[in-house]
Structures are given as C-alpha cells and as structure tokens.
Amino acid sequence: MSMKKIIAALLALVLTVSLAACGAAETPTATAAPKEEIKVTEAAVAETEASGTRTVVDALGRTVEIPAEVTRIVAMGNAPRLCSYLQLADKFVTTNQGDLSETVFMAFGWAYRDNWQDLPIAGAGGYGSFNAEAILEADPDVIVCTYEADIVANLEAQTGLPVVSVAQGVLYAEDYEQSLRTLGEVCGVSQRAEEVIAFVNACLEDLDRRTKDISDADKPLILGSAATFRGGHGIQGVYVDHPVFSAVNAKDAAIGLEKQYFDTGVEVDLEKILEWNPEVLFLDAGNLGLVEAEYAENPDFFQQLAAVQNGKVYQWPNSTSSNANLEISLVNTYYAGMVLYPEAFADVDFEAKAEEIFEFFLGRTGYLEVLTEHGVGYDNITLGE
C-alpha cells in the first residue's frame, strides 16, 4: 500500500467530521504573484534529487515540494480547463461535478466528460468545496487548483498532499500564460504549454495586424450584450472592456465602464443603450431567449437601435461557462473581426479557422458543428422571428 493510501486510512475518521465544515460559498480565485515564474534553485535540486521530489513556487508565492514525476492529478477550480488545454485530461484521477455538466458551452467538458464519467467526484467545481476522502482514495501525486490561500491551506491540511495554486487568469493576459507555464512545469508538459501560448499569441498578432490601422471613422460602434457573468443576462447585461473586442481594436460602447471585482460585465439602463445606439450588437446565444422575451414585451425599444434597424444583430456562443473558455473566445474574436471589417478578413475562411482553433485546444473535431446543431453557433439574426 502506498504512503498516500496509508494516510487516507488514518485520516478517514477525522475527515468525516472536518468535511462537514467545508462550505461551498463562492471564493475569489488565486491571483498571480507579480511576474513570478516557477523557481527551482540548484540547492533545492541537489537536496531533493535523492528523495525524488522537486520544489516549485506557485501563484500564491508558496514553495511547494512535489514529486519529481507527476502522473496522477487532481485538478480543481479552473485548473481542469487549463490542464485540458495542456492535454493532461488522461492524467486526472478525479473529476468535479461541474465539469460533467451537459452544457455545450463548456467546451473542454464536451471534449473529455466521457473520459471522466466514472472518476470519483473531488468537489463541486469552482467554488472551493472538496471531498478530501475521495481525493486521498484516488492517490494523486499533486493537487492543482485556482484557489486562494485559505482554501489551499485547508486542502493541504486535510489531505497531506502537495497543492499548487495557479491564477485563474485574465483572458489574453500575462497571468494566463504564467498559469499555463506553471502547470506545464508541474505536470511535465512545458513544451505543450509553450505551444499553447505561442498559438494564442500568433492569433492575437494576426488579429491586431489586420485591424490596427483601420481608422476610428471606419469602425462601427459595437456592443456586446446578453452577457454571461454571474449567470445569464438580457439586453441590459453588457461586457465591459471585453478582451475579444480589444483584440480587434473595436470601437466598443461599453469600454471603461465601472464593474465589480472579478466581473466581466455590468447591468446598464435601457436609456444608456439608447444613448449609445450601437451600430452592431453581439449577443451570447445562450441568453438569446432572455432577449427575445424582452423584445416581445418592448419591441419599440429595440426598433430604435441602429443595429436592429440595419440588420446588424449577431449571436455567438457564450465565451464563459463558470470561467472563460479560451478556445471559444479566440473564435469569437475572429468572428467579430470578420463581421466588423470584412475586407481585412477577406482571405480568412471562418469555418476552417474555427475548426483549427477548436481542434488545437480540445483535441477533437466537430465542435463547431455541435454548436450549430444546438442553435448556439455563429449567425446574423433577426429579433422577434
């Protein structure tokens, strides 16, 4: 019997009591230490080689001793999504209830949930709750997560296992890259981490190159609405400082609006939307039913909008399901660019580009078709029909 399983047997009784105290309240995810990379000093290497371990510094600034080789992973919070991008899904020894969701917008879940269906449940998902006994029984080498220090300390205390916390990451930002690099180093897939980072950056450079020299006078005013943050919203829920729009240098009506910490959007008054009068509307397809209900109740409001009058209302898949989907966000960014600046993207086959991105991240083909079959793909729509 492995040492971890011996620990599991010894802790089983006390865990029954301690687990009852574990709440499922929403907790902010880990934030990255300023430009901290994983650090393995020569002294640490020399000291740990004999014991088959190594040390890493995580996003919380903690030095964590982990096995020299990691083959069995428990991933929690947003880490399952990040690990899936790194092709680590087959190393999971547990899953989370939320990652088995049937929603089509959880792209990594669509790709891998069949692989995880029979794994023990380690927790609910992204809120910090966990089942320590199930984790110990699964005998992992390491736990990776996106939790804050108090949850990480509790997780380590109840399992006796090394816990590495990475930043949840802001879409297209440096801390997202850092999280991928940290997970790549911990799990022995640094090359794949660099490939993912290079792929994203190549896409962003391509998008910027195509759009950076377009004058503001030639850009339509746009709004991302029916936004997904803390649940779905109707027309009054708008994305703020949306990285998808920034990546194509769009003229975004909602840029600079004040928002709550960790939120990606806000609710605004109908009068504010009329004041903006966006020429193009992008709506999250998963929340389109809310907008259609609002249209049925108040068609006069919608018919005053230039986007509605000119047939410039578009749906795209929700880029958020619990946390941001990197692959959907990238495809949405290309879609926005092609809608807003068709001449700049005249040489891009959208379906081919979308399939390329989805397959790179998910290791599966056919996801674009799945979105279309569910009625939540990419389309120019008419409200009220």
PLM features per residue range, with description:
Residues S18-A32:
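Bacterial lipoprotein signal-peptidase II cleavage site
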